């Protein structure tokens, strides 16, 4: 297959396109992008047949900022007959053998999601035919490739596969999180999603545990503080504004009515630093850099608000500058990840982990 299909948020196709063009080039996989505004997907068409397999194997999905999910894809199947959509799809997947799962999806747009009921019903007979053809195993297997069938409109679909070790575990790349009734704001879901995105399940018990000390800069009214409290942490909530009363009643939160840019922790035993402030992204990055250089935290999750134009260029420039500044100031052992999360809008979420191979005292 020569196409790479990438899911993204509607309105961010240009950013996703610019990113995959650059990243594919770094792997010497030439091609060009096909993208339309508000389609919520991008297709990277490789010049060489089967080059998409190189990308789904060698380009880590977690290293892409704007793509939620990706798969090696066929050319667009069009005019699928209403009386037999299955046969052309099975034929297009003839080179896929012994996959462990099939997902029938749509892009994340209101128009495409009108097909979601059809996709659910269609999955059952399609699964049976794929098992008969040998493209799909009789039993689901999480270690085998995943077959993707993405309907972008009635009778129009891209089909292909991803590898389970380089694929989102979520349908359409979207985690299904529930808004807690007592959470102070919807922003709470951003940190909840970020923990799932940046900290593997098997490491969460060690790295996100009860009793840890944390700081929330720009905490009011407490959406992110809520997620820290829910996980049993003690939180220094820094904001001139008021905090949610129920959060304060837990006894786990100490409210500092201060400017988040001027606050300095009294004790240097902070594991998690979180920050979701409506500020210029470069200024927030400088703040996190200062905390990192001072060694005031172990892991940080923070949001960078995106400009209206050149969003990919701006984000990559800020992240490159951050890494340069940290290294110039003696902080050389760290890991940075960045993702445009489902619950993000005009922002991206960044994870910075200092000394990832060194235990926390």
UniProtKB/Swiss-Prot annotation:
Please provide the record's keywords in A-Z order.
Cytoplasm, Methyltransferase, rRNA processing, S-adenosyl-L-methionine, Transferase
Pfam families the record matches:
FtsJ, RlmM_FDX, RLMM_N
Chemical reaction(s) catalysed:
cytidine(2498) in 23S rRNA + S-adenosyl-L-methionine = 2'-O-methylcytidine(2498) in 23S rRNA + S-adenosyl-L-homocysteine + H(+)
Compartments annotated for it: namely: Cytoplasm
What EC number(s) is this enzyme filed under? 2.1.1.186
The reply to whether Transferase figures as a keyword in the UniProt entry is yes
Q: Where does S-adenosyl-L-methionine bind?
A: 187, 220-223, 239, 259, 276
- Output the SUPFAM superfamilies linked to this UniProt entry: S-adenosyl-L-methionine-dependent methyltransferases
What is annotated about its quaternary structure and interactions? Answer: Monomer.
Its function? Catalyzes the 2'-O-methylation at nucleotide C2498 in 23S rRNA.
Q: Which family does it belong to?
A: Belongs to the class I-like SAM-binding methyltransferase superfamily. RNA methyltransferase RlmE family. RlmM subfamily.
Q: What is this protein called?
A: Ribosomal RNA large subunit methyltransferase M
Question: Which organism was this protein described from?
Answer: Shewanella baltica (strain OS185)
List the top taxonomic levels of the source: Bacteria, Pseudomonadati, Pseudomonadota, Gammaproteobacteria, Alteromonadales
């Amino acid at each position: 297959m020569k196409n790479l299909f990438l899911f993204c948020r509607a309105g961010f196709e240009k950013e996703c396109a610019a990113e995959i063009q650059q990243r594919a080039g770094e792997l010497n996989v030439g091609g060009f992008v096909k993208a339309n505004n508000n389609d919520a997907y991008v297709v990277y068409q490789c010049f060489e047949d089967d080059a998409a397999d190189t990308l789904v194997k060698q380009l880590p999905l977690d290293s892409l900022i704007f793509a939620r999910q990706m798969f090696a894809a066929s050319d667009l199947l069009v005019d699928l007959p209403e009386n037999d959509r299955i046969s052309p799809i099975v034929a297009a997947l003839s080179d896929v053998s012994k996959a462990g799962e099939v997902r029938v999806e749509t892009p994340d747009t209101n128009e495409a999601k009108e097909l979601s009921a059809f996709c659910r019903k269609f999955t059952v007979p399609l699964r049976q035919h794929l098992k008969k053809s040998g493209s799909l195993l009789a039993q689901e297997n999480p270690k085998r490739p995943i077959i993707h069938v993405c309907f972008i409109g009635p009778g129009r679909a891209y089909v292909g596969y991803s590898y389970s070790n380089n694929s989102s575990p979520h349908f359409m790349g979207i985690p299904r999180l529930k808004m807690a009734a007592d959470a102070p704001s919807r922003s709470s879901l951003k940190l909840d999603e970020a923990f799932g995105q940046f900290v593997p399940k098997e490491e969460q018990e060690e790295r996100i545990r009860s009793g840890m000390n944390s700081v929330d800069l720009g905490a009011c009214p407490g959406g992110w503080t809520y997620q820290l409290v829910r996980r049993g942490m003690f939180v220094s909530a820094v904001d001139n504004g008021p905090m949610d009363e129920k959060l304060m009643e837990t006894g786990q939160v100490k409210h500092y009515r201060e400017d988040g840019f001027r606050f300095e922790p009294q004790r240097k035993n902070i594991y998690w630093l979180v920050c979701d402030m409506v500020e210029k992204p470069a200024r927030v990055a400088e703040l996190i850099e200062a905390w990192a250089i001072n060694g005031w935290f172990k892991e940080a999750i923070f949001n960078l608000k995106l400009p209206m134009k050149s969003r990919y260029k701006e984000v990559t420039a800020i992240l490159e500058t951050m890494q340069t500044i940290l290294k110039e100031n003696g902080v050389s052992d760290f890991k940075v990840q960045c993702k445009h999360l489902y619950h993000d809008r005009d922002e991206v979420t960044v994870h910075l982990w200092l000394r990832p191979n060194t235990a926390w005292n």
